[in-house]
Amino acid sequence: MAVTALYVHVPFCAQKCRYCDFDSRSFASCDLDAALDSYFEQLYARLDAFGKAGALDQIRTVYVGGGTPSLAGERLVELARRIRAWCAPVEFTCEANPESMTAELAAALAKVGVTRVSLGVQTLDNAELTAIGRIHDADRALSAIATVKNAGLDVSCDLMCGLPGQTAASWKRTLDGVLTAAPHHVSVYPLTLEEGTPLYRMACRDESLEPDEDFQAACMDVARELLGAAGYHPYEVASYALDGHECAHNIAYWTGRGYLGLGRSAAGMLDAEDFDRLAGLFPGVSPRGDAYRVRLVQRDDDATAFEVEHLSQREAAAEDLMLACRMTRGVASDLLVRAARVIPADELAAACDRALELGLATWVPETLGVHEGPFTSADVVAGHVRARLAPTHLGWLDGNVLFELFWDLA
């Protein structure tokens, strides 16, 4: 498992959204600069430690998320420059919110090698934006898309369905408006109410604020139809892209590649060999024992505390199968054959059969022009037939059931 992806977390926001349970902090403007300066100095030091240890040598994708990284302004530009000094990623994404994405920042990011900006648009209905605590309006969101494109950067838009007050008509207007702005990539997420968030507490008092799952499914269907008609193909459960503009960083997550996390709440995943090689970067973390993979989450600003999860080879195989189900291509036959080395073949074939019975997945031959004839899941798992297990439309809408079938094999 080569370490090919780097995630950097910037946990600062001008105002925390009502639905958000991510690690992010909002400050009065008088305190924000000092907090950002302190945090970024710690990021720089940690980055240098990674670089000197050779941890960044094979990095191909970088993703700076948050929080609101664009709130950091010139500090974000300097961070990107320093990352580029240690590695040469082919894709470099920074998240941004419309209110803090200026033409000057977009141009500066492009100059230091950022290739892509992911904008938190969410909706183009101003009443819906207010309901979820966003501080930009629809015009500012559309302006930000144009600003990023004018700087020569790819732009992705995040959208949400099931928002308070959202209707089928307002959802279609949002999709139409985004398509007119023509980003390169669109992600569509159903709103979930996380316990402890302001919106969760509001919904406890007013049930009308709770997302309607049937409405969300209808919204996802409309999005798939309109985005598909406009040339965006669904390559992952929540994401659509124009050809050649898929998010390589997210694909690295879903295809079992190693990744590093930098910053508070950032997660990394290392195989046994890479963990042993880089263990000195994680003070206080005990040896892995016989773990096949190690997942680490930084729990403080200065990288002295980590949450650690050890995965056995069987757990890692089950996770790879589950994550592959997020991709439109589904689970490749090679992955199934490898998984059968550590998961009993009859259990693995039974999980595939159950996905077929529930209408969540279908077999798709991997060799064009070759008609395999009748075959069973056991044939694929044994390597006698080359076919991938691809999610159906129902599997796409009801992905959690499909994911659980394979994670339960751990």
Residue ranges: model-predicted function:
Residues 2-5, 24-53, 58-342:
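C-terminal scaffold of the Radical SAM
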Residues 6-10:
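Short active-site neighborhood of thiol/selenol oxidoreductases, capturing the structured segment around
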Residues 11-24:
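Local cysteine-cluster metal-coordination motifs and their immediate loop/turn environment
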Residues 244-246, 354, 382:
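Short solvent-exposed loop/turn micro-motifs enriched in small/polar/acidic residues
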Residues 342-357:
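Short amphipathic alpha-helical interaction segments
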Residues 356-382:
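A short, conserved structural fragment
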Residues 393-410:
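Short, amphipathic alpha-helical interaction segments positioned at domain boundaries
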